[in-house]
């Protein structure tokens, strides 16, 4: 074989070998059904989840009302009141006197927050409960759900006082309401023990307390009562257009809030402050 023929034969054999190798290991080709290698499928944990809605707050079992009850246009209070005007309908004013026991005042505030019941506190200023509970009471005062009025500084019988001593009793309590809560108690004064006459009424009016507030029924709990007795008084007096007195002096009433709400529900009663009735909801008593 000539050298030239040998080289041609060798080149042809090499080309055939390379062709065979290529056939055994074909190059990969793109498959349109496969995802790109740079974009692997997202795992379930990487999927975007929708936000979980916040749960709706549940109402307290004591809940009775939201805000003031529907009321007619207010009419100015007389110089002496014992009950609410007839045209207010199924509305009662629950008023709470004294404040001997700070824990009872605190419990009344929880009752107000849980039930929505609107309360008028007649404050006897010498008791520490009115400063002890300031931080908890202040938002309720500012919202108008709780009203503060004057029940004197030391709870004396007003009919036994001179004009100067009576004015001092009112002024000291008024100063507490102003300094601690930024409000006035005027024009509502409740005389301790119900002791009043034309002289006390006129003297109170000289310092802005032009309406003496008496009552049309009481829980009777200025002193310590059993639960059965107090509940009986509540059943007797929680009626439409009544101004009813309770006292923040002993814890008995704090065990009966559920039963008091039951009475109000059974009688379709809502509670209003004196401001709601005589000035209209939203009355500003800041000074």
PLM region spans:
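N-terminal pre-catalytic segment of deacetylase/amide-hydrolase enzymes
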Residues: 2-94, 101-107, 114, 135-137, ...
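Short amphipathic alpha-helical segments
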Residues: 107-108, 134, 201-202, 257-258
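Catalytic grooves of carbohydrate-active enzymes
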Residues: 239-275
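Metal-dependent polysaccharide deacetylase catalytic core of the NodB/CE4 family, i.e.
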Residues: 91-92, 113-234, 240-245
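Residues that form or flank phosphate/diphosphate-binding pockets in enzymes
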Residues: 103, 131-132, 199, 252-255
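Active-site metal-binding loops of divalent metal-dependent hydrolases
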Residues: 96-99, 152, 248
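Histidine/acidic-residue-rich catalytic or RNA/ligand-binding cores of hydrolases
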Residues: 224-225, 256-258, 285
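Non-transmembrane alpha-helical segments in soluble domains
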Residues: 7, 109, 174, 258-261
């Amino acid at each position: 074989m000539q050298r030239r023929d040998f080289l041609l034969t060798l080149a042809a054999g090499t080309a055939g070998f390379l062709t065979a190798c290529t056939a055994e290991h074909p190059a990969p080709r793109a498959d349109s059904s496969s995802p790109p290698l740079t974009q692997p499928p997202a795992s379930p944990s990487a999927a975007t989840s929708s936000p979980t809605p916040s749960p709706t707050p549940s109402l307290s079992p004591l809940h009775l009302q939201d805000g003031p009850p529907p009321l007619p246009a207010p009419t100015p209070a007389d110089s002496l009141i014992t009950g609410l005007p007839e045209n207010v309908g199924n509305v009662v004013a629950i008023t709470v006197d004294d404040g001997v026991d700070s824990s009872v005042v605190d419990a009344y505030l929880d009752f107000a927050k849980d039930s929505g019941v609107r309360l008028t506190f007649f404050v006897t200023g010498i008791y520490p409960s009115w400063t002890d509970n300031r931080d908890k009471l202040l938002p309720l005062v500012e919202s108008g759900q709780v009203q503060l009025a004057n029940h004197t500084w030391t709870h004396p019988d007003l009919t036994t006082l001179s004009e100067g001593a009576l004015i001092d009793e009112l002024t000291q309590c008024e100063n507490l309401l102003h300094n601690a809560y930024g409000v006035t108690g005027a024009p509502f004064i409740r005389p301790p023990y119900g002791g009043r006459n034309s002289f006390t009424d006129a003297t109170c009016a000289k310092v802005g307390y032009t309406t003496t507030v008496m009552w049309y029924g009481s829980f009777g709990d200025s002193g310590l009562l059993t639960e059965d007795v107090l509940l009986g008084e509540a059943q007797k007096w929680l009626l439409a257009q009544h101004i009813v007195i309770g006292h923040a002096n002993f814890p008995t009433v704090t065990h009966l809030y559920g039963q008091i709400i039951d009475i109000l529900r059974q009688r379709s009663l809502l509670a209003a402050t004196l401001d709601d009735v005589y000035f209209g909801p939203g009355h500003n008593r800041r000074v």
